[in-house]
Amino acid sequence: MSFPFKPVLLAAIVSQTFPAFAADPVPQAHQDLNEVKVIGGRKAQKLGEEKVRRQALDKQMVSDESDLVRYDPGISVVEGGRSGSNGFTIRGVDKDRVAINVDGLAQAESRSSEAFQELFGAYGNFNANRNTSEPENFSEVTINKGADSLKSGSGALGGAVNYKTKSASDYVSEEKPYHLGIKGGYIGRNSQKFSSITAAGTWLGLDALMVYTRRFGKETKNNSDAADTVITDNKQSWNPNAGSTNYGSRGVARSKPDPQDWVNKSTLFKLGYNFNDKNRIGWIYEDSRTDRTTTELSNMWAANWKGEALGDTRSRQDISYRKRIGFEYKNQLDKGPWDSLNLHYDRQTIDMSTWTWDLPTDYASNGVNSDVYHMFRNIRQKNTQFGADAEKQIDFSKLVWAMQYGLGGSQNDNDNRDHSYWVRLYDPKYQTSNNQELTMLVESSSKNRFAYWNNTFQFGDSSQYRLNAGLRYDNSSSKAKDNPNYTPAIRGQIPYLGSERKHSGFSYGLGLDWKFTPRLNLLAKYSTGFRAPTSDETWLLFPHPDFYLKANPNLKAETAKNFELGLAGSGKAGNFKFSGFQTRYRDFIELTYMGVSSDNPNSPNYAPISDGTALVSSPVWQNQNRSSAWAKGLEFNGTWNLDSIGLPQGTHAGINLSYIKGKAKQTNGQETPINALSPWSAVYNLGYDAPSKRWGINAYLTHTAAKKPSDTVHSSDDLNNPWPFAKHSKAYTLFDLTGYVNLGKYFTLRAGAYNIGNKKYYTWESLRSIREFGTVNRVDNKTHAGIERFTSPGRSYNFTLEAKF
């Protein structure tokens, strides 16, 4: 048997061990089990769903998305360059193909289409990532793996990450009318310091919650020595050991991360009033801003081939801003069409912006007359969403029928603001040129309407069978908007884009939970997902004779079908879940070469330009629905309470592993590798939580296999060669140690040491983020000098101190 399947063999052995343990279904106090809804007297087992509660977020000292999924091998974070992460990777798809929602509110789409990256992304002028969220604002995070648009809507092809914000009821009640929590800490990998305050109270039916968090830090450290790097140009070889002190400090061969300072401020405020036990209104306000200032020393134009300063020094300020205001009304009925009803309305604005300025090398000699060029790029996404969600449970003599149903809609606008100008270096308010406001991105608006009905039936002796069946219908439309600030070439294309474009379709979900013994459950699941084309996939255009990109309003939605089968068990000795899955994707949207242009209006390669004529013999590109794909794999996770074999109470062990493989199928029938598939990984855990709950310690061993070059593809234009940087992917094993101690009644100290062995390694997500063209996120294409800039952090330490009153 080949090595990658050894963890699967281990999983099978462990799964056969659990049924031998005693059948007491009550979990031990130290277990972190999934939250499950109880109907008909027993808990639900769910495939592909994991909940991370506030207690676990605190215990793991989660400060960002990477910490959230650190010990979940089935999900990873997409590298987004200097401005942070760009969503998640689940089951072979990433970015906009994994839905991200906060309280059901969809978060920003990225500008990550292949066309955008070809034209703009490689030069770093846009902050085109998906926005991130403040972990201290959340009471729990639900990670759904596998297609699941029934719950999460558009984008849930590979899965979804759903955040739920804190509420006053998480902390206060009639018996405890107030709560104050204060937390501070240090994150070693990026020299981050943070503080957070959570305050809640209730009085005469009125309750309020406030969470304020501030973080500031520097660039994420790597683990590089770069001592053996030699870079070669066309004429000669330059050896850094032969005498250049500048070597590696600038340009693509730089071995250290670019200097960066960043600050994040986040506020969450909730106010609610209970008229009585049956009626409640609520209001929410969220505000979050992250500013990252980077000196871009690794920019391709920052140095000559020796690493010596070449010209101006480029700096960037990436700004991510999110604001949300929402209202809700909740009602409960003893009899009627619902047991509970939630009406909600939210307005959200997300700004992703980048300031760019170049510090000239001769600024000192020019004195007060030195000028600086400023460039500003802003992508704004405004979203208004409303909905009604209801739940109803009907108890029959031998059957419990629980249903969830509702409807809703949203209005979305994608706007841009781009301008550039010259200012005095020593007086930036003094402009020395006109403000040029021209935008190259087509703005758009869209709307969506949906309705869903989800049912759970539980029947049989001791509620032995549990059957889920759900249906959802979505209808969306999109259209391009005019803007007087479009470049003449762009504005001339607007009449050719046509009228509003529509997408509609159904999403389904079926599930079975059969408790065939007191300790074992057989689980099955079928679900579907879809993703409507993003604004830049549909409307992005670039009428240039060297690269003519046509918009495509006729794109179809991408779709996915997910099949899953699993076995789950629980007892006094612990719990486990073992599952296999297969997902099939269709109509992937890809940038496609259409051939040379034509001046025939009836030709698909018709290439009009602003003066009313058309280009002839220019290369034409367009986003098209082309390939399909499949992914299948195995997942196992389990917890073993070792006091069941005589070890001290509170001792426990765990394992969590994921193995996945898949291929993309091209239009010519050729099957090719999928770069977004992560190599198999396993996490082993051994820990102890004192029965007194005063202290605990956990050790984690994470092993990740190499991504074989043969399992990668160079690009959509070169399907027969591997990704050139895949050869740097090697297997690695990391050892982490975390612990906590409760200092009296009110204080908790937590600490962690990560990568204790100081292992030098590259994650696959980091290697596949390297660009072969453009000016940012580059290494030397020929020698790969600068590759060590992409190593992961070495040994680092975290600690937090929390007080709760």
Feature map (PLM): residue ranges:
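Acidic, small-polar-rich N-terminal luminal/periplasmic segments of exported/outer-membrane proteins
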Residues: 24-171, 298-299, 565
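Short loop/turn motifs that connect adjacent beta-strands in outer-membrane beta-barrel proteins
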Residues: 30, 152-153, 168-178, 205, ...
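C-terminal beta-signal and adjacent terminal beta-strands/loops
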Residues: 110, 223, 530, 581-587, ...
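Outer-membrane beta-barrel translocator/receptor signature
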Residues: 120-125, 135-145, 149-233, 262-265
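Transmembrane beta-barrel wall of Gram-negative outer-membrane proteins
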Residues: 188-217, 222, 227-295, 321-323, ...
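Face-selective signature of the C-terminal outer-membrane beta-barrel domain
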Residues: 274-288, 320-490, 502-505, 509-515, ...
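Outer-membrane beta-barrel signature, preferentially recognizing the C-terminal barrel domain
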Residues: 306-336, 444-446, 496-507, 511, ...
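Gram-negative outer-membrane beta-barrel transporters
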Residues: 402-404, 459-461, 476, 582-584, ...
